[in-house]
Regions:
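HDAC/HDAC-like amidohydrolase catalytic core signature
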Residues: 1-218
Length: 218
């Protein structure tokens, strides 16, 4: 990713060079390549298997937050809008941690719907992502947090996806659905307390059927 592509999503303090490594550029660049291929009709969907992760990186970047310096999904959204005319975007974050950076960046944007399924912020970093955080005054109801209790497994996640997330996406009618695809709600993750299985994640992804997925934590 170039400085200009990064600057469309972030303000880096004191500058981009101080906050961004080649690994960050490669991760964002890989996701941008995938997004271009999708937008140009070369692929029906795709998964950017990139690291470092990004969903804790906020608009203002002044250091690492939860292993994140650049918000890959935000860089992708800015690129899709500028290069491909995409307007309405849905980001569904299934990482076990709340994507506080993604929420921060799009909180006042009525054309980006951000939905997060995550372990209750009272029990896990970053301590945010509550149901009352619904978007700014000009973008009310464009941010939906679904905090889940520790111990939630396949049944709980799939119920929320089918009964809440999918109907909301249907009503919003996005041009593109992006999955912030954290894998750390898996029962083996040492930093969280959820009980999702590999089969549960597979079914979750099958139901969501995102156009683009970007690897996050786990």
């Amino acid at each position: 990713a170039t400085d200009l592509e990064i600057a469309r999503a972030h303000i880096c303090v004191p500058n981009i060079a101080a906050q961004v490594t080649e690994a960050h550029r490669a991760a964002c660049g890989g996701a941008l390549t995938l997004a271009d291929a999708w937008a140009e009709g070369q692929i029906a969907n795709g998964f950017a298997l990139v690291r470092p992760p990004g969903h804790h990186a906020m608009r203002m970047v002044h250091g690492n937050r939860g292993f994140c310096n650049l918000n890959t999904e935000a860089v992708v959204v800015a690129h899709l809008r500028r290069q491909h005319g995409i307007q309405r975007v849905a980001i569904v974050d299934t990482d076990v941690h709340h994507g506080d950076g993604t929420q921060d960046i799009f909180y006042h944007d009525p054309n980006v719907l951000v939905i997060g399924l995550h372990q209750d912020g009272r029990t896990l970093y970053p301590g945010t992502g509550f149901i009352g955080e619904l978007g700014g005054p000009g973008a009310f109801a464009s941010n939906l947090n679904i905090p889940l209790p520790p111990g939630t497994g396949d049944e709980g996640y799939l119920y929320v996806m089918e009964e809440l997330v999918l109907p909301i996406l249907e009503a919003f009618q996005p041009d593109v659905v992006i999955n912030s695809a954290g894998q750390d709600a898996h029962y083996s993750d040492p930093l969280a307390r959820m009980q999702v299985s590999a089969q549960g994640y597979a079914r979750l992804t099958q139901l969501l059927a995102p156009d683009l997925a970007v690897l996050e934590g786990g």
